[in-house]
Regions:
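Short active-site-adjacent structural elements
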Residues: 182, 207-209, 235-240, 255-258
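Phosphate-bearing ligand-interacting subdomains
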Residues: 216, 223-242
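Short, high-confidence coil segments that cap the C-terminus of an alpha-helix
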Residues: 1, 62-64, 222-225
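C-terminal accessory "lid"/substrate-recognition subdomains
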Residues: 91-226, 279-293
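Phosphate/Mg2+-binding loops and adjacent switch elements
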Residues: 7-140, 146
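Short hydrophobic/aromatic-enriched beta-strand-loop microsegments
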Residues: 65-66, 84-86, 144, 193-200, ...
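Short, flexible loop segments at boundaries between secondary-structure elements
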Residues: 201-206, 244-275
Length: 293
């Protein structure tokens, strides 16, 4: 399969760019590089113009399917399945709040175009979430799947070892993701305690050697605490001296309760894929070739 992504923050020399595990974060972007390292059988293609990137990928790789990362509003490319990712914030206090007063790009009516909803939850109780799903999403009649990132251990950035936990020892958390609270909750669930300190950086932050030295100094000040980072940050931090001893949070997706769905997500998606893949792949490739002719 092929993943088409805009590659936020990427600075490739040419487009489209096929991202390999050996690419640099500056060239490929942190998220495409993480995808390339985590999914070795997939082709990760960076191109802000998804139609061009899709045609290029189809011509070279003849994929069974193409996945658009953040493509719900990308109208130049027709889709067969639209999966809309929502958070508890989207369903509760952020419901229907379109930019600039909120994080939504479109109003509630756009949700009718979804094939299914994926709701990303975090550890702990979330008051009002089940009711919001029942009253705000379920009436749309589309399958709804909840999921969470479950921690499964730690790994050294330099590849020297893995651990299930830190045996109760102190740690600090350095993270440059959009929702630091999620990383804090995931780390605390795995390690059984809150971090001594959280060092939040901007999403997609380009870590420097000075940042690494600052993180190490904060850890020393906290009693030689361990340093824990997210996998997204690790692909950038591992390039710098002194970061090899940092721990990366290893996570996996676990699905939870579902609504309007008779089957688990994997089975539901597999059935849809089998219905659509062969026929529509041919249509997509023909349309791309005609457009570029």
């Amino acid at each position: 399969g092929v993943v088409l992504t805009r590659g936020y923050g990427a600075k490739p020399g040419r487009l489209p760019l096929l991202v390999t595990p050996a690419a640099s974060p500056a060239q490929a972007g942190d998220e495409p590089l993480l995808l390339a390292k985590s999914h070795r059988l997939a082709r990760i293609v960076v191109d802000p113009k998804r139609k061009r990137g899709g045609a290029w990928a189809c011509e070279r790789f003849d994929p069974d399917f193409v996945l658009l990362d953040d493509g719900f509003q990308h109208l130049p490319v027709a889709r067969d399945i639209d999966l809309v990712l929502l958070t508890p914030h989207d369903l509760l206090e952020g419901w229907g709040r379109v930019c600039p007063v909120g994080s939504w790009r479109e109003g509630q009516s756009a949700l009718r175009s979804a094939s299914a909803f994926l709701i990303k939850v975090v550890p702990g109780k979330q008051p009002g979430l089940s009711e919001a799903i029942e009253t705000r999403l379920k009436p749309l009649g589309k399958p709804i799947f909840t999921f969470a990132l479950k921690p499964k251990g730690l790994a050294r950035l330099d590849g020297s070892g893995r651990a299930g936990n830190l045996d109760g020892e102190d740690y600090i958390l350095a993270t440059g993701i959009a929702d630091p609270a999620q990383a804090v909750a995931t780390a605390a669930k795995l390690l059984g305690r809150q971090p001594r300190q959280v060092l939040p950086f901007a999403d997609h932050h380009a870590f420097s050697q000075a940042d690494v030295e600052n993180i190490r100094e904060v850890a020393r000040t906290a009693g030689d605490a361990h340093v824990v980072v997210t996998a997204k940050d690790a692909v950038k931090l591992r390039l710098h001296d002194g970061a090899g001893s940092f721990w990366t949070l290893r996570t996996e997706v676990r699905f939870g309760p579902r609504y309007n769905a008779d089957a688990e997500f994997d089975d539901w998606f597999g059935a849809r894929f089998n219905e659509l893949a062969t026929h529509h792949r041919q249509i997509f490739r023909a349309a791309m070739q005609k457009e570029l002719a």
